[in-house]
């Protein structure tokens, strides 16, 4: 009996430790995120090109960016990286309840960000900043819009992951999936920090 318990404990420990080893899913995700980084680099290049060719005030009237609204939304998204990582730590310990708790919090923070961005779009469009209205409108909505789509994709990933952990026994494969989702979430957070800095502070 003691031998059986010892064998079981060794197997669980081995599976947990295996999460720290590189695997094809994690490596593939990193390679894919590298290609996504190049995509966003193209959007940054487009933004700076439009800015260089504007020859006037940037952003041009009637655009009025609301920094006081953007800062709290940004801080919430940054904080969501920490809650996401806490979920990863829970997954590595085999703590499915901790994983769910932290990932639900992360999901809600990401949703808050998306809704905040939607409100900013509503405000800007109401003041005449549109895609066909100016070069600034085009590059602003393209850059931030594609980022919002990526954040939304992350929210969908959280939903699927949480559903999987609720419908079946927690497995090392699910723990690996949670780690992969965290890679993606950290990526969209880092991209937003760069976008936020460029759009709101580099005039």
From Swiss-Prot:
EC number(s) stated in the UniProt entry for this protein: 7.1.1.9
Keywords carried by this UniProt record: Cell membrane, Membrane, Translocase, Transmembrane, Transmembrane helix
InterPro entries membership: Cyt_c/ubiquinol_Oxase_su3, Cyt_c_oxidase-like_su3, Cyt_c_oxidase_su3-like_sf, Cyt_c_oxidase_su3_a-hlx
GO cellular component: plasma membrane
PROSITE patterns named in the record: COX3
Family label: Belongs to the cytochrome c oxidase subunit 3 family.
Name of the molecule in the record: Probable cytochrome c oxidase subunit 3
Species for this entry: Mycolicibacterium paratuberculosis (strain ATCC BAA-968 / K-10) (Mycobacterium paratuberculosis)
Organism classification: Bacteria, Bacillati, Actinomycetota, Actinomycetes, Mycobacteriales
Protein's gene: ctaE
